[in-house]
């Protein structure tokens, strides 16, 4: 087996572990490595390629996640037999996929896989900590709703959502300053479905959606899946670059702006009131709508709230998305779109075309959960925990990160953005970090073109304060090994 690595930095270069994985995959698909063949030991292949053994381990992990190889402790890693259906021979027909499907596959394969990361501190994911879920309280509410609602709850409901949850959601948004009633709310399966519906509302195949760079990676996938292109708007310390925004929105092929002004993902910052007002003025001048993603808006644990764009908008420019996936638990899969005017009817038509009804029992239970004050009690506890976790990460960053690094100080949400010294590609750093016992999200996955980045996102969603300190210390050791003893800790905040 021959593997050739591109080691020179460049925008087109894949991370080293992915180069290894893709070349092994090619050997298997070409049947130069047969089913049952044993791959080289991790240590041996790392030595022959002159890479760290954790880089090879990450490559093998990616292949295992794809079902191409399987590892057995004490025996090694082996090529798996082609997958069969009901004992039949391997499929002779492989369908030709659409360009969109191929591109989505490429995007998914470019993302790190953490399936066998063992005891590493999970600072890569924004999935909430299950130990903080108010599961018992929600179960009591759900049981009560099912008992009182009976069989009708299990029928198809309206496309817009459960009537009581629509009223409750409108009241919840009004508390945040967004003037809306139940007629302007459409419930959806989390913010992800809301993003897809909002993109389809404004853009067709070949059109362009403007979005910050870096940005939420799933909006890039959603745009790709709809045959859309994206136009990056650079993020500055105080928010997106307004000059670039105006030039971009003035282009006729650009149909809308997607933005995360509150607890930005991945950066964690919150755009100021003045910056928001300027953004809305630009959108109004250019006649382009704004899709505001407020998925973490309920998670403020410090500082003074800033009005949502939808609260400042008086002309109907803004479509506002919200979700309970991060603030409550993701399994409920309930989000909401707030809109005005003809956009509401159009969104309902788009939703009905692919999704006849929602899970009425869960929506009814969530409405009761909010009305009973259970959600507010949960948020009060969650905010205290998140503040303590954020502070633990900030203290550890100041202690362990090298000179030249800087990071954000979020006032809510789950994420901190770290900018490392020049010359570091965090895609390659990840393999060393996994070996040292910490996971993070490399900045490249939030760039529109996936290019290399010296930045990374650290999450304090899943791990407790002690684990987070341990994870940052591990990251510091990895960076010290990369940069040499000359690196010294320095607290610099963005």
Where does each model-flagged region fall?
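N-terminal basic, amphipathic alpha-helical segments
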Residues: 1-144, 348, 352-359, 367-370, ...
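Short beta-strand "wing" residues that participate in macromolecule-binding interfaces
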Residues: 70-71, 180, 440-441
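Conserved core of the PLP fold type I
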Residues: 142-287, 298-315, 386, 466, ...
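Conserved core segment of the aminotransferase class I/II
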Residues: 314-384
């Amino acid at each position: 087996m021959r593997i050739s690595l591109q080691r020179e930095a460049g925008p087109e270069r894949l991370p080293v572990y992915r180069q290894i994985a893709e070349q092994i995959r090619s050997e298997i698909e070409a049947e130069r490595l047969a089913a049952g063949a044993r791959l080289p030991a991790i240590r041996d292949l790392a030595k022959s390629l002159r890479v760290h053994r954790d880089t090879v381990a990450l490559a093998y992990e990616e292949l295992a996640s794809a079902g191409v190889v399987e590892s057995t402790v004490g025996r090694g890693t082996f090529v798996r037999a082609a997958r069969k259906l009901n004992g039949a021979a391997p499929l002779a027909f492989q369908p030709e996929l659409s360009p969109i499907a191929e591109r989505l596959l490429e995007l998914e394969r470019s993302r790190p896989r953490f399936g066998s990361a063992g005891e590493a501190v999970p600072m890569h994911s924004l999935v909430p900590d299950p130990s903080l879920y108010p599961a018992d309280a929600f179960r009591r509410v759900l049981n009560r709703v099912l008992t009182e609602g009976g069989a009708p709850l299990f029928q198809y409901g309206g496309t817009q959502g459960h009537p009581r949850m629509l009223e409750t959601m409108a009241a919840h948004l009004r508390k945040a300053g967004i003037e809306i009633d139940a007629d302007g709310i459409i419930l959806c399966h989390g913010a992800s479905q809301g993003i897809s519906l909002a993109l389809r509302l404004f853009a067709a195949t070949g059109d362009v959606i403007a979005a910050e760079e870096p940005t939420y990676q799933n909006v890039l996938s959603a745009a790709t899946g709809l045959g859309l292109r994206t136009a990056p708007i650079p993020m500055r310390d105080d928010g997106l670059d307004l000059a670039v925004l105006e030039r971009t929105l003035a282009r006729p092929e650009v149909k809308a702006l997607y933005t995360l002004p509150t607890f930005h993902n991945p950066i964690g910052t919150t755009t100021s009131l003045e910056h928001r007002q300027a953004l809305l003025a630009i959108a109004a001048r250019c006649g382009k709508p704004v899709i505001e993603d407020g998925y973490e808006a309920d998670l403020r644990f410090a500082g003074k709230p800033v009005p949502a764009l939808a609260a400042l908008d008086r002309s109907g420019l803004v479509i506002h998305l919200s979700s309970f996936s991060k603030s409550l638990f993701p399994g409920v899969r309930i989000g909401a779109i707030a809109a005005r005017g003809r956009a509401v009817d159009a969104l309902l038509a788009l939703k009905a075309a692919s999704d006849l009804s929602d899970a009425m029992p869960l929506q009814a239970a969530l409405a009761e959960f909010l009305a009973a004050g259970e959600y507010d009690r949960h948020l009060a506890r969650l905010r205290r925990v998140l503040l303590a976790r954020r502070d633990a990460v900030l203290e550890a960053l100041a202690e362990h990160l090298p000179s030249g690094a800087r990071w954000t100080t979020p006032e809510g949400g789950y994420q901190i953005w770290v900018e490392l010294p020049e010359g570091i590609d965090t895609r390659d750093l990840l393999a060393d970090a996994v070996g040292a016992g910490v996971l993070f999200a490399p900045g490249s996955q939030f760039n529109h073109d996936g290019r290399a980045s010296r930045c990374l996102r650290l999450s304090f969603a899943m791990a407790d304060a002690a684990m987070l300190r341990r994870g940052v210390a591990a990251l510091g050791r990895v960076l010290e090994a990369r940069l040499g003893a000359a690196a010294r800790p320095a607290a610099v905040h963005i």
